[in-house]
A protein has these predicted regions:
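N-terminal secretory signal peptides that target proteins for export/translocation
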Residues: 1-9
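Bacterial N-terminal signal peptides
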Residues: 14-28
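Accessory terminal helices/loops
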Residues: 28, 32-55, 236-312
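Conserved beta-strand hairpin/beta-sheet module of binuclear metal-dependent hydrolase folds
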Residues: 60-121, 204-217
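Short, hydrophobic/aromatic-rich segments at coil-to-beta transitions
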Residues: 67-73, 179, 186-190
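Hydrophobic/aromatic beta-strand patches that form the interior of the parallel beta-sheet core
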Residues: 71, 133-135, 159, 192, ...
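Metallo-beta-lactamase
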Residues: 95-97, 102-104, 190-195, 199-284
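Active-site HxH/HxHxD metal-binding segment of metal-dependent hydrolases
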Residues: 104-186, 280
Length: 312
C-alpha cells in the first residue's frame, strides 16, 4: 500500500500563507483497501518543532493519512507549543473532526481549509458529499481555538462545549455514565464520557481502526487532573471498555514525554527532537489504572515511564 501524505508548504519564506498539495492521494487504491492502515502511528515521524522557530519552514499543519477514511493532523509546535493532534474520521454520510487546535487565526492555522480539501478529495472519489460534525475531546482552549473557522459553514455542525451539550448531542447518559454509539455511515463510533481532566471530557472508540482516542485523559505526557474521584472512575471505565474491545492503540492529543522513560519536556517547549511516540498501549492504560487505584482518595504526583499524573 502506498503511504499517502498531505502537507501545507509555505508560499514564500516568512509568510503565513500556505498552499495545499494534493498530489499523492491515490484515492482509488486506498478505497480498495479502506481498512488497512497506511502507516503505523507508533512509527510516524511527527514534526517536533525547532530550536530556532524563526527559521523553521515546517507547515502549520502536518497531515498523515492513517487509512482511506482516517487522518491525523498535528499543529506545528512553533505555532503553538501545545502542538495538539486532531483527528478526522469519515463515514459514508458523516465525518467527525475531533478538536480544532490551539490557534484561532485562519491565516496562520488554516484548519477549515485543510479539512475541507481533505473531504473534497474523499467526496470526489465517492461521488457524494458528507456532513462534517466538529466535536471536542474536552473544553480547553488548545482544543477549540479554531472553532470559529467552522461556525456557520455549510454542511457543518459544531457540537457545544459544556458537558450537558456534549451529552445531549451524542445521547450520553449522565447517571450512571454510559457510552453511546455515533453513526457516520458504515462506521459506528462509541462515545464514552470520561470526566476528570475536565467535566466534558470524552473518549471515542473506532472499531474500524481499533483506535481509542482519549484526549488529555491518557497520553504520553502530564495528565492534569481537575476532579480526582471522577478521573479515577474514568480511567477504570476506559480499562473496562478496552478489555471488552480490541484496542490497537490508545491515542491522546499531545506528546510531552521524551523517549527517556519518565522524563518529560517542560511546559512551553517548542523543540522535542526525542519525543515519545504518539500512541500508548493497553499495558500503559492498565498501569495508569493501577497507579490511580493505589493512590486511592489521596491524589499525588506520580511519574511513570510513559506519563506523569499531576493532580490540581
Amino acid at each position: 500500500m502506498r503511504t499517502t501524505r498531505v502537507t501545507y508548504r509555505p508560499l514564500l519564506p516568512g509568510l503565513a500563507g500556505l498552499a495545499f498539495a494534493l498530489g499523492a492521494f491515490a484515492l482509488g487504491a486506498c478505497t480498495a483497501v479502506r481498512n488497512r492502515p497506511a502507516v503505523d502511528l507508533a512509527r510516524v515521524a511527527w514534526q517536533h518543532g525547532a530550536a530556532d522557530c524563526a527559521g523553521q519552514t515546517d507547515p502549520a499543519i502536518q497531515v498523515v493519512r492513517y487509512d482511506a477514511q482516517t487522518w491525523v493532523l498535528r499543529q506545528n509546535k512553533c505555532l503553538h507549543y501545545e502542538a495538539p493532534f486532531l483527528f478526522l474520521l469519515v463515514g459514508e454520510h458523516t465525518a467527525l473532526l475531533l478538536d480544532t487546535g490551539a490557534t484561532a487565526d485562519s491565516a496562520a492555522f488554516p484548519l477549515y481549509r485543510t479539512v475541507r480539501q481533505l473531504l473534497q478529495g474523499w467526496e470526489t472519489a465517492h461521488g457524494h458529499p458528507v456532513e462534517l460534525v466538529v466535536a471536542h475531546t474536552h473544553d480547553h482552549g488548545d482544543h477549540r481555538a479554531a472553532d470559529a473557522q467552522f461556525r456557520g459553514r455549510p454542511h457543518v455542525r459544531l457540537v457545544g462545549l459544556d458537558a450537558g451539550q456534549v451529552q445531549q448531542f451524542f445521547g450520553l447518559r449522565s447517571k450512571p455514565l454510559q457510552s453511546a454509539g455515533f453513526e457516520l455511515g458504515g462506521r459506528r463510533l462509541e462515545i464514552l464520557p470520561i470526566p476528570g481532566h475536565q467535566a466534558a471530557s470524552i473518549a471515542v472508540y473506532d472499531p474500524t481502526t481499533r483506535l481509542l482516542f482519549t484526549g488529555d485523559t491518557v497520553y504520553p505526557g502530564r495528565l492534569y487532573v481537575q476532579d480526582w474521584p471522577a478521573f479515577r472512575a474514568s480511567v477504570q471505565r476506559l480499562v473496562a471498555f478496552a478489555t471488552r474491545h480490541h484496542v490497537a492503540y490508545v491515542v491522546g492529543n499531545h506528546v510531552e514525554m521524551s523517549r527517556t522513560p519518565g522524563v518529560d519536556y517542560p511546559t512551553g517547549t517548542t523543540f522535542q527532537p526525542n519525543e515519545h511516540p504518539l500512541p500508548l498501549r493497553m499495558a500503559d492504560l492498565r498501569r495508569l489504572n493501577r497507579a490511580v487505584r493505589a493512590l486511592g482518595a489521596h491524589p499525588a504526583r506520580r511519574v511513570d515511564d510513559a506519563f506523569i499524573i499531576v493532580p490540581r
